[in-house]
UniProtKB/Swiss-Prot annotation:
Catalytic reaction annotation: D-ribose(out) + ATP + H2O = D-ribose(in) + ADP + phosphate + H(+)
InterPro entries, per the entry: AAA+_ATPase, ABC_carbohydrate_import_ATPase, ABC_transporter-like_ATP-bd, ABC_transporter-like_CS, P-loop_NTPase
Sequence similarity: Belongs to the ABC transporter superfamily. Ribose importer (TC 3.A.1.2.1) family.
Assembly mode: The complex is composed of an ATP-binding protein (RbsA), two transmembrane proteins (RbsC) and a solute-binding protein (RbsB).
PROSITE patterns: ABC_TRANSPORTER_1 (PS00211), ABC_TRANSPORTER_2 (PS50893), RBSA (PS51254)
Protein known as: Ribose import ATP-binding protein RbsA 1
Source species taxonomy: Bacteria, Pseudomonadati, Pseudomonadota, Gammaproteobacteria, Enterobacterales
Chain positions recorded as ATP binding sites: G37, E38, N39, G40, A41, G42, K43, S44
Pfam family, one: ABC_tran
This protein's UniProt keywords: ATP-binding, Cell inner membrane, Cell membrane, Membrane, Nucleotide-binding, Repeat, Sugar transport, Translocase, Transport
Entry-linked CDD domains: ABC_Carb_Monos_I, ABC_Carb_Monos_II
Length: 501
């Protein structure tokens, strides 16, 4: 089968790092090509070379059989290559039609916008995707899943023959994910080629035909998905066998450190639980169950309306995140780009941001040597891959950004570490490193709350698990009691079993 798109022998270097070396990618009509690799493997760089954001240093790009060079996103888009980014590029205050045709509106012979034609054409695009809503609806009124469908419709408006989807299900519910897969099947039947970038093995084996593996900027293999197992694919990605995906540390927790009684706040209703020294407490539940809200109320990022919290026997009142930090409670957000990191600042500045008091003299000036030493120690301990501590953190891979976010929390010397979706958007190799770090914190006596939507992660890493349902605690289970079935029953409200200490 002749490829719609071929990239061969692609090289791309930046100061101090070779991002791509001999990388290759083929996209075939009517097939979905998964592009996988650890964070930092070169997937994003390859997409930027393909769409003309970066100029390649070497290699060839064949588009519909002809050697081509795209001068920028506009030229690749007009040629028929569409990309749907992880962060959606839509304007909430405009309608669907206005978003789809932004900058290329239909005009009548008087030079005015032809709204009737524009909405009719947008409705046709939505109908192609079997969507039930009309294009006069505001994008801000749509769910994230439906907004993603608008992005696909926008790509189709350019008559795109190849569509690139970057982590498309990251913020979707299970129902929205199934809708996306239905649309992908529809696009395949129209002969379009799809590049599907994802860390989620289940999705790759469900919806992709072929897979291309990158490792350290190099092309490793192209295979039919049907010829692989999850283990063999992971082995190609990381270059080694992952013997134990969730390396649980069997060490008995100590005395009760944190006690939460009848906590209430926005989205949180009468929640009570305990957390021991050197314990990993898993928090499970469906999207919207109130897990993140509970953590934010506990930390001080959301207001507490009632309830009582003690830490090491002393009452803790957190009216702001500063109160949480001052009391030894650290929260690492699920949305590191919005709440966790300052992307324009360096690795060093991000890591030491909340711990500057430890590096300050009485007059307020910084002890730069102490700060640099501490940051250097954490970079080494956490195996953060960065050319230097002065590198802008926005240029690091997702896994390395997450390590910096966790390191920043630990710099404040906390007693309780709350990790909200710590491995979201992180590849399998970096996940394993984060799990090993969590075990190290546990061994050092740190109390850890692990909030995760990945049930195997919660089951694999936790000593004890609590489950949230509609703002309430619907279950509490020991490691031995917990199974996927039991946790899911509690998550949907079919089971209510809470054993308070």
């Amino acid at each position: 089968m002749e490829a719609l798109l071929q990239l061969k022998g692609i090289d791309k270097a930046f100061p101090g790092v070779k991002a791509l070396s001999g990388a290759a990618l083929n996209v075939y009509p009517g097939r979905v090509m998964a592009l996988v690799g650890e964070n930092g493997a070169g997937k994003s760089t390859m997409m930027k070379v393909l769409t003309g954001i970066y100029t390649r240093d070497a290699g060839t790009l064949l588009w519909l059989g002809k050697e081509t060079t795209f001068t920028g996103p506009k030229s690749s888009q007009e040629a028929g290559i569409g990309i749907i980014h992880q962060e959606l590029n839509l304007i909430p205050q405009l309608t669907i039609a206005e978003n789809i045709f932004l900058g290329r509106e239909f005009v009548n012979r008087f030079g005015k916008i032809d709204w009737k034609t524009m909405y009719a054409e947008a409705d046709k695009l939505l109908a192609k995707l079997n969507l039930r809503f009309k294009s006069d609806k505001l994008v801000g009124d749509l769910s994230i899943g439906d907004q993603q469908m608008v992005e696909i419709a926008k790509v189709l408006s350019f008559e795109s023959k190849v569509i690139i989807m970057d982590e498309p299900t990251d913020a979707l519910t299970d129902t929205e994910t199934e809708s996306l897969f239905r649309v992908i099947r529809e696009l395949k039947s129209q002969g379009r080629g799809i590049v599907y970038i994802s860390h989620r093995m289940k999705e790759i084996f469900e919806s992709c035909d072929d897979v291309t593996v990158f490792r350290d900027g190099q092309f490793i293999a192209e295979r039919e998905v049907a010829s692989l197992t999850e283990d063999s694919l992971i082995e190609m990605m990381v270059g080694r066998k992952l013997e134990d995906q969730y390396p649980h540390l069997d060490k008995a927790p100590g005395d009760i450190r944190l006690k939460v009684d009848n906590l209430c706040g926005p989205g949180v209703n009468d929640v009570s639980f305990t957390l021991r020294k050197g314990e990993i407490l898993g928090v499970s539940g469906l999207m919207g169950a109130g897990r993140t809200e509970l953590m934010k109320v506990l930390y001080g990022a959301l207001p507490r309306t009632s309830g009582y919290v003690t830490l090491d026997g002393h009452e803790v009142v957190t009216r702001s995140p500063q109160d949480g930090l001052a009391n030894g409670i650290v929260y690492i957000s699920e949305d590191r780009k919005r709440d966790g990191l300052v992307l324009g600042m360096s690795v060093k500045e991000n890591m030491s941001l909340t711990a500057l008091r430890y590096f300050s003299r009485a007059g307020g000036s910084l002890k730069h040597a102490d700060e640099q030493q501490a940051v250097s120690d954490f970079i080494r301990l956490f195996n953060v891959k960065t050319p230097s501590m002065e590198q802008a953190i926005g240029l690091l891979s997702g896994g390395n950004q997450q390590k910096v976010a966790i390191a920043r929390g630990l710099m404040t010397r906390p007693k309780v570490l709350i990790l909200d979706e710590p491995t979201r958007g992180v590849d399998v190799g970096a996940k394993k490193e984060i799990y090993q770090l969590i075990n190290q914190f546990k061994a050092d006596g740190l109390s850890i709350i692990l909030v995760s939507s990945e049930m195997p992660e919660v089951l694999g890493m936790s000593d004890r698990i609590i489950v949230m349902h509609e703002g309430h605690l619907s279950g509490e289970f020991t490691r031995e009691q917990a199974t996927q079935e039991v946790l899911m029953a509690a998550a949907v409200g079919k089971l209510n079993r809470v054993n308070q200490e």
